[in-house]
UniProtKB/Swiss-Prot annotation:
GO terms for cellular component: plasma membrane. Its main location: membrane. This is Large-conductance mechanosensitive channel. It is a multi-pass membrane protein. The gene is mscL. Gene3D superfamilies: Large-conductance mechanosensitive channel, MscL, domain 1 (1.10.1200.120). HAMAP family: MscL.
């Protein structure tokens, strides 16, 4: 099998395609969450904390000199990134929890019930016939 044929077989597997779709949707979801945090969540929090804009929070290590930009630690952006992460993690957790609940329900439905009355009766008849043959 040539390298190209092997790659086609690999890429056409369902799991690889599902993973690719998941990555694309995840990237789009990440942008939505970042916008939600930066544009919806952080402004009211900043207002409550006295008009603080978290994206501007930084510690200047070295001031700008001429054309050389300042050296800063932008911890406000880091705080926003942490909140993004927490929201995305919670959304993924809730999604997985829902999927696991559905899987459990399907497994419970697939579990066969005990023997039916007909099966129990046939088992009793079989046992009686075996006991009569043994006499």
């Amino acid at each position: 099998m040539s390298l190209i044929q092997e790659f086609k077989a690999f890429a056409s597997r369902g799991n690889v395609i599902d993973m690719a779709v998941g990555i694309i949707i995840g990237a789009a979801f990440g942008k939505i969450v970042s916008s939600f945090v930066g544009d919806v969540i952080m402004p009211p929090i900043g207002l409550i904390l006295g008009g603080v804009d978290f994206s501007d929070l930084a510690v200047t290590l070295k001031a700008a000199e001429g054309s050389t930009p300042a050296v800063v630690i932008a911890y406000g952006k880091f705080i926003q990134t942490i909140i993004d992460f927490l929201i995305i993690s919670f959304a993924i957790f809730m999604g997985l929890k829902a999927i696991n609940t559905l899987k459990r329900k399907q497994e419970e439905e697939a579990t066969p019930a005990g023997p039916t009355k007909d099966q129990e009766l046939l088992t009793e008849i079989r046992d009686l016939l075996k006991s009569q043959q043994g006499k």
